[in-house]
């Protein structure tokens, strides 16, 4: 994905300082400071059904989307040489906009993936298959597996294993019993059951599968860290060797998982949350294979719902956007299609964007500004009386090694291996692309 915050400033009206037009100066700040500070903005920008909130960054995003849409649609409307970035961007946008074909295909793109889950014969095979699906975007595993900088040694990357597996995101949705939470949970159960019936299950089977999914996710949620616990950096860092991982968590087939996810061999890993991972071991051992397959099936359908026909999209929107977030109206199809293209080819779109709206001269000016700030800060560090010479030296060394990122990278991502053929039926597009279409939730 690419950031357009600074770039937009070169194509928009320049605003400096605090705008009194966005305030309500008739309100008393001591009584209602929010109305005083933002009343003018709220009156000038009444909330539309598409949004649950609307601030200045949302307005900036709207402006950017309109500019990006113009760039993308220009490529989509005119033939592009096969294999070029323009062809890939235009073809993907057209695929995302083609609701007629998607409605005609229905669940056809999903059938091979569901068949793969339903054909699992053992719990050992289950772990391999869900890892393979996870790599393709189905999020079928019960934990997250990735790579990030080691928090105790930023010069090194480290494999991270973290809690996951719960579609509602926050554990309290599964555990609290207040009326609002119960309403969300009941809507979630109805949503799970609806997705199963939409892929062909009868009501009885869909009910049974829904109960299995909810039971598994609730068990994971009970062991998961709360939002407060997740803010404890040190409490979410448990570095160990790969050998120790195999010893401490024998209920998970780590070799099958690692290879299916495409990870090379590695020596060290951090299990960020210990207890949820042990709970996954219990679930894999205690639940029947049919229950585990029901969980994986739901994760696959849920991940792809926004990429399928309008009925699946509506079901996903009604739960995640309307019930969970309060939005009353879905975004226009073009906005969702732009989101799809950004999700798959964001760097390529970003390259086109900066060529038009953020020229190299603008980047050079901003880099020079940052360099001047570094010099000024360095002089201030040297003049500090309370800082020891050794500490000053370390601070200046850190300042000089500050990696500046402005506007866009010096080296762009290579998309040459990515093939998007607009002439193919949507069902022939790989599941990776199908998942990419689901990014605009």
Residue ranges and their predicted role:
Residues 61, 248-251, 270-274, 331, ...:
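Intrinsically disordered, low-complexity linker/terminal regions across diverse proteins
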